[in-house]
């Protein structure tokens, strides 16, 4: 289990929720 991997995934999720237009 790598905490750094969780932080990276959390950052990606935050980016996706902050900029949902990029996914459309």
Swiss-Prot record:
Keywords of this entry: Extracellular matrix, Secreted, Transport, Vitamin A
Main location: secreted
Keyword Secreted: yes
Entry's Gene Ontology molecular function annotations: retinal binding
Assigned GO CC terms: extracellular region; interphotoreceptor matrix
Location(s) in or outside the cell: Secreted, Extracellular space, Extracellular matrix, Interphotoreceptor matrix
Function: IRBP shuttles 11-cis and all trans retinoids between the retinol isomerase in the pigment epithelium and the visual pigments in the photoreceptor cells of the retina.
The protein's name in its UniProt record: Retinol-binding protein 3
Lineage: Eukaryota, Metazoa, Chordata, Craniata, Vertebrata
């Amino acid at each position: 289990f790598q905490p750094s991997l969780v932080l990276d995934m959390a950052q990606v999720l935050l980016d996706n929720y902050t900029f949902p237009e990029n996914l459309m």
